[in-house]
């Protein structure tokens, strides 16, 4: 934790939830022989947590402390609890109203991130965003504004915690595709293990399908050519539902065909981002949202395919950290995860724009 001694805290347990296009949230239960650790020494400090197995580092989690709690003291140790989130969390505390003119969305987002000290960000975009003549952040946080713009463009974001060897540093990734997603080792399914196996495996896997919008139509108006039908449509082929479920929207918030079709495609993907999903449990510490892995050895061969992880909840327990107060329970790690077929493009749903009460006087 920050510049504090690395042996000051022992990890009793942790839970960390990460999802695409959401801030991850980690809760660390710690113990220390020092009963006098104060909030001022911990809040806003960088945290580095490494999961080990048999002396081998498996996974690294990094974040910033935004909550601190001191618990009870036992015979020799005092309990503490820390909440960690990515540095991007700070933008949720910064509320503003401003106007951006003649800028592309990636330039706009880069400006906000750099102003707030988020330097390690990567834009992995296949499509060059169109210039926005006029774009307003209105009575909303910097984070809400960035998430709104990203969803409109069809971008998702994820946080890289960094590698255990230090070759890959923590950072924010914004992307409009999953082609460069981290590739994990194949995940072997072992439903009979019931979570008791020490070998890396997926021991629960549930596949689901849902009826969702089958097509999207978006229309807007251009004063340059009022008679022109500025309308774009996109449909999704699905054999398991009716095809007449159309989502129509006006205005589509685009001024030209160059942005109208991508906006329409992105909206359909977002409305269908949970049409085909899977949920499971595993002991694979390397599972991280935004990564891809092939499932193997499942008794249903159609599920032995490539999957994109969209959410992972990591849980670890190490009661021995409390020594004489810890009992005889073993050290454990497991996770629950959500995934979609890797040939689908997962995109976040759009949020509503803030409403303006009336004319604003400059």
What role is predicted for each listed range?
Residues 1-362:
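Amphipathic alpha-helical and helix-coil boundary elements used as assembly
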């Amino acid at each position: 934790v920050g510049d504090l001694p690395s042996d000051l805290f022992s990890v009793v347990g942790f839970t960390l939830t990460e999802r695409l296009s959401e801030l991850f949230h980690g809760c660390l239960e710690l113990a220390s022989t020092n009963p006098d650790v104060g909030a001022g020494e911990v809040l806003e400090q960088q945290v580095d947590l490494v999961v080990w197995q048999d002396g081998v580092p498996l996974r690294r989690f990094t974040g910033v402390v935004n909550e601190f709690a001191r618990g009870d003291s036992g015979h020799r140790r005092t309990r503490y609890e820390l909440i960690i989130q990515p540095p991007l969390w700070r933008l949720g505390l910064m509320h503003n109203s401003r106007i951006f003119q003649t800028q592309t969305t990636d330039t706009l987002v880069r400006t906000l991130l750099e102003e707030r000290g988020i330097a390690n960000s990567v834009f992995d975009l296949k499509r060059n965003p169109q210039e926005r003549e006029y774009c307003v952040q209105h009575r909303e946080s910097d984070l809400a504004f960035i998430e709104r713009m990203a969803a409109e463009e069809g971008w998702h974001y994820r946080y890289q915690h960094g590698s255990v060897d230090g070759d890959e540093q923590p950072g924010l990734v914004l992307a409009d595709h999953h082609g460069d997603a981290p590739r994990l080792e194949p995940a072997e399914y072992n439903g009979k293990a019931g979570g008791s196996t020490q070998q890396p495996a997926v021991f629960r896997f549930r596949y689901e399908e849902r009826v969702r919008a089958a097509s999207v139509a978006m229309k807007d108006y251009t004063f340059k050519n009022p008679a022109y039908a500025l309308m774009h449509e996109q449909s999704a082929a699905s054999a398991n539902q009716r095809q007449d479920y159309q989502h129509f929207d006006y205005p589509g918030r685009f001024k030209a065909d160059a942005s109208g079709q991508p906006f329409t495609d992105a909206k359909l993907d977002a409305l269908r981002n949970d049409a085909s999903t899977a949920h499971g449990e595993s002991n694979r510490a390397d599972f991280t949202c935004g990564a891809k892995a092939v499932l193997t050895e499942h008794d249903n061969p159609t599920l032995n395919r490539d999957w994109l992880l969209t959410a992972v909840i990591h849980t670890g327990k190490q009661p021995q950290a409390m020594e004489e107060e810890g009992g005889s329970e073993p050290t454990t790690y497991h996770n629950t995860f959500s995934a979609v077929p890797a040939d689908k493009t997962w995109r976040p749903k759009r949020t509503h724009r803030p409403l303006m009460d009336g004319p604003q006087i400059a």
